[in-house]
């Protein structure tokens, strides 16, 4: 708030200094201060008329507007009927092997491919070693 007061004071001084040489002047300035909670707009209008009598009119209007925020619904995901996340009562059926899902079949297929590749590489290495030792005549 001190920053707005300082800017407002500088505007008033500049308008008064500017209007001292003229017979009539009007100056309008607007400053905007933004924060995460609200937007505050200050508008200063100064009218100075120089004649036999000096009349100075200063009008200050301030408008504050609260920024819109999104609402957060904490119940986006509903709990399951059998949910006991913090009190997990494990039963034996939780550890049974199941082939009823695609993930189980995919994992088993990957394991078979990996074992097959390992056997092929192992056979190749052993065969190379066997042929290398037998060709020398040992």
From Swiss-Prot:
Query: Which keywords belong to this entry?
Result: Disulfide bond, Host Golgi apparatus, Host membrane, Membrane, Signal, Transmembrane, Transmembrane helix, Viral envelope protein, Virion
Q: Where in the cell is it found?
A: Virion membrane; Host membrane; Host Golgi apparatus, Host trans-Golgi network
Give me the segments passing through the membrane: 102-122
Question: Cellular component per GO?
Answer: host cell Golgi apparatus; host cell membrane; membrane; viral envelope; virion membrane
Chain ranges on the Virion surface side, renumbered to this chain:
22-101
- Which InterPro entries does its entry note? Cytomegalovirus_glycopN_N, Herpes_glycoprotein_N_domain, HSV_GN
Looking at the Swiss-Prot or TrEMBL record, what is one Pfam family this protein matches? Answer: UL73_N
In the bilayer, the protein is annotated as: Single-pass type I membrane protein
Q: Which intervals lie on the Intravirion side per UniProt?
A: 123-138
Keyword field contains Metal-binding: no
**Quaternary state and partners of this protein?**
Interacts (via N-terminus) with gM (via N-terminus). The gM-gN heterodimer forms the gCII complex.
Task: Kindly give the HAMAP family that the UniProt entry links to this protein.
Answer: HSV_GN
Q: What does this protein do?
A: Envelope glycoprotein necessary for proper maturation of gM and modulation of its membrane fusion activity. Also plays a critical role in virion morphogenesis.
**Family membership:** Belongs to the herpesviridae glycoprotein N family.
Q: What is this protein called?
A: Envelope glycoprotein N
Q: Which organism is it from?
A: Human cytomegalovirus (strain AD169) (HHV-5)
